[in-house]
Swiss-Prot record:
UniProtKB keywords: NAD, Oxidoreductase
Name of this chain's protein: Putative 2-hydroxyacid dehydrogenase YPL113C
Lineage top rank: taxon: Eukaryota
Provenance organism: Saccharomyces cerevisiae (strain ATCC 204508 / S288c)
Induction statement: Glucose-repressed.
SUPFAM superfamilies named among the record's database cross-references: Formate/glycerate dehydrogenase catalytic domain-like (SSF52283), NAD(P)-binding Rossmann-fold domains (SSF51735)
UniProt EC number: 1.-.-.-
Cited function: Putative 2-hydroxyacid dehydrogenase.
Enzyme active site: 313, 342, 361
Similarity section: Belongs to the D-isomer specific 2-hydroxyacid dehydrogenase family.
Record carries keyword NAD: yes
Chain segments annotated as transmembrane: none
Amino acid sequence: MITSIDIADVTYSAKPRILVPYKTQWEVASHLPEYRKLAERVEFYKYEMSTKDDFVKFLETHRINGFWLTEEFFTVLGNPSSYIEFFPASLKVILVPWVGCDFIDGKLLRSKGITLCNIGPHAADHVTELAIFLAISCFRMTSFWEYCFKYVENGNVEQCKKYISSDSYEIVTDSYHGQEMKFPSRTDKCKPNKDRKVVHLAEKYTVGGKKMESPMNKKVLILGFGSIGQNIGSNLHKVFNMSIEYYKRTGPVQKSLLDYNAKYHSDLDDPNTWKNADLIILALPSTASTNNIINRKSLAWCKDGVRIVNVGRGTCIDEDVLLDALESGKVASCGLDVFKNEETRVKQELLRRWDVTALPHIGSTVADMVIKQTLITLENVQDIFVEGGDGKYVLN
């Protein structure tokens, strides 16, 4: 039986064809038996990326039924949205092996008969792990201590202890880039010994004037209460006995679906939504309604010394306002895995602050996730191209 015919430079196969782009890394767990079994029914077309022009020519001359996106695609060829007008009529689905899809217009795809699928709620555990790490860092100032221990005091534990109860700063030079930055002073450098007073640590357990405390028994406001937000709430409640409050754009979650008590807030313009939180965690997508949710007005309603974690999207925070709030102490510290302008250059003022834990968008970046996202994307492929369904996790 003939299953493919070569015409010019184009090979037409009888199987549904799933485009999988790569250049220097292969992001699909193709060693899995599930992949190999499904490869008997569909063709996983490995496309080696080169230039944007070459990719456009490829789209114009090849039949593609599915497009399995990879992170490397963004690095090499840019946003896939810029190629929508070149997508062949045969394209039936865009397969996104992660959660966030705000980089592409799902409604526009649907108007062209293209389904947009992601991996549903299956990244929640790994993003939650990072959110908890960032929350701990915010309360315990672990990023400051690590930097201080490794690069300032060169492993001298006793010298590190001299930062406790400090409330003044000095300008130091970043050992990596040679840039100046503000950094807490050691207490033995703040004043001459004869002028120093005995410090009551129970009242002033601070570094740089900012309190170090346990996350136990605190109140958290979670903005965005889908699968990730709910999982974060569950873990913070179980591990730290935190009181959970949340905002969800589509309304409250049924209490029977949660294994903990959580207070719902319906209005972000109500000061009562913000006033009790010791910690705010953002797990929101990037939309017009979530843009700059953390702003001057919302922070004014917060407690002094509130702490902020963002594992959603960088567009949700007005970064200039956040910097001002960190400087004034309105925000004690923050943990950020996402930023504005990630495609170009993240705001350097944030990266140089001692009270910011900054990570390069690694919410679900673990080896386990490569396996998991492959298996779930295969479920979408199986449902659409073998079983004739619409896809397991459809977004549009």
